[in-house]
Amino acid sequence: MFGCLVAGRLVQTAAQQVAEDKFVFDLPDYENINHVVVFMLGTIPFPEGMGGSVYFSYPDSNGVPVWQLLGFVTNGKPSAIFKISGLKSGEGSQHPFGAMNIVRTPSVAQIGISVELLDSLAQQTPVGSAAVSSVDSFTQFTQKMLDNFYNFASSFALSQAQMTPNPSEMFIPANVVLKWYENFQRRLAQNPLFWKT
């Protein structure tokens, strides 16, 4: 029903079923994992009105499992990428895996999937740092480049009284640069690939 993928490792499709509605994947050497993808295999959909809460568990310094809610998968959203690298020192949250006897080893974390009502999923709050940024690196680069250019150009701003007339030099009013900057930001927000047209 589910699959789990860590970059550079084989895809896991054989989740350990620990209860009728609970599944876990082991993540050996979890200290070296930054992101994990959880997805539905497409062979068995969730029953109508159901989805799966996705949890990350790692052993604390005493070997006690710390569970943190990452997010969810549903028939309408059959896959999700989660950033887990920053979660390994956080606090746990409420989870449905507490009373289960799940075999653990010290350097193995787990991804847990709990099949629950969609209404219940909508009320849960995942750990904030688990979400992968929806802004791609190109958009981030473009935004940083815009900010850098505007700040650089603005650092040379002079009032007309401060200017020394030089007929061989052109000048661009700062308000024109600001207008371009705001226009570019607006267009980038509407369509990050607008520059390709």
UniProtKB/Swiss-Prot annotation:
Transmembrane regions listed in the UniProt entry: none
Localization of this protein: Cytoplasm; Cytoplasm, Cytosol; Nucleus
One of the record's GO molecular function terms: Hsp70 protein binding
Lineage: Eukaryota, Metazoa, Chordata, Craniata, Vertebrata
Superkingdom, natural source: Eukaryota
Name of the featured protein: Protein Hikeshi
Required for F-X-F-G repeats-nucleoporins recognition and nuclear import, as annotated region: 18-55
Gene field: Hikeshi
Primary role: Acts as a specific nuclear import carrier for HSP70 proteins following heat-shock stress: acts by mediating the nucleoporin-dependent translocation of ATP-bound HSP70 proteins into the nucleus. HSP70 proteins import is required to protect cells from heat shock damages. Does not translocate ADP-bound HSP70 proteins into the nucleus. May also be indirectly required for organization and/or function of the secretory apparatus in Club cells in lung.
